[in-house]
């Protein structure tokens, strides 16, 4: 059984323009985003199917790395995705990994 990891290195943290704009005008939303990032880093990927959750765990334990995803809702039920591309891909160098906070419609 693979255990839920703590994710120490998620690369560069990016926000889409939509999320960034909303954070600038809505303090509660910005606070929620900070809290959701903490959940994500702690290996709590929110509202994912069991298959997607397991895929995240496998990617964390796979030496080839992979992609991680979390799906959440903010205080007003706005859906947020957090996606890490290139997690643990040491063969591509440390600058390859990045984590993006976005609205699903921005994907």
Residue positions per predicted region:
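Compact soluble domain cores
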Residues: 1-69
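Short, compact, well-ordered microdomains
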Residues: 59-107
């Amino acid at each position: 059984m693979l255990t839920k990891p703590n994710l120490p290195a998620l690369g560069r943290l990016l926000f889409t323009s939509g999320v960034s704009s909303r954070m600038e005008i809505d303090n509660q939303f910005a606070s929620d985003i900070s809290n959701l990032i903490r959940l994500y880093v702690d290996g709590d990927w929110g509202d994912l199917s069991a298959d997607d959750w397991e895929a995240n765990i496998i990617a964390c334990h796979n030496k080839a790395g992979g992609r991680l995803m979390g799906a959440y809702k903010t205080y007003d039920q706005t859906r947020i995705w957090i996606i890490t591309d290139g997690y643990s891909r040491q063969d591509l160098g440390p600058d390859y990994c990045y984590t993006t906070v976005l609205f699903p419609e921005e994907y």
